[in-house]
Regions:
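Flexible gly/pro-rich beta->alpha loop and the following alpha-helix that scaffold active-site loops
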Residues: 1-26, 31-32, 38
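Conserved strand-to-helix beginnings and helix N-cap segments that scaffold or border functional pockets
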Residues: 8-12, 86, 127-128
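Pocket-forming structural segment of enzyme catalytic cores
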Residues: 17, 24, 32, 36-112, ...
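Acyltransferase
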Residues: 122-137
Length: 137
């Protein structure tokens, strides 16, 4: 959706309520919402990515996806995670190869996952596979 995670305090409330109880998948603003609720700062990007396909690299921090592999992800966002971001439980698990912007997260202790890009987009290859891996985790 449009806006900044701080525009949606009730969503942050719901996230905190279900954090350790339910599997959570955040996509785009949901990804930003998770990071914001965990102390991350979400900022404006220099370039806006609406309807843009990026090459995204899977990092070694991922427990679900094969590290050093790449996917193509459909991006529709103007905000990003300000780094560095430190968390005891959340790892950034994918990055845009060109800009190094955080593109995915996995929580080590809770079943929380997120994508900055849109796995359901026609611009994303294997998006269905990404969601299926999370649902079966």
């Amino acid at each position: 959706g449009p806006g900044h995670p701080l525009d949606y305090p009730k969503t942050a409330e719901v996230y905190r309520k279900f954090k350790a109880k339910k599997k959570i998948i955040g996509i785009c603003l949901g990804f930003q919402q998770i990071l914001s609720a965990e102390g991350g700062n979400i900022i404006q990007q220099k370039k806006i990515y609406h309807g843009y396909q990026s090459v995204i690299e899977v990092l070694k921090t991922s427990r679900l996806f094969r590290s050093n592999s790449t996917i193509y992800g459909g991006r529709y966002h103007s905000l990003k995670l300000q780094e560095p971001f430190k968390s005891a439980t959340i790892d950034i698990t994918m990055r845009c190869k060109k800009t190094n912007v955080a593109m995915a997260l996995e929580d080590k202790t809770n079943h929380i996952y997120g994508f900055q890009f849109h796995p359901e987009s026609f611009l994303t290859n294997n998006g269905k596979h990404l969601i299926q891996k999370i649902l079966s985790a």
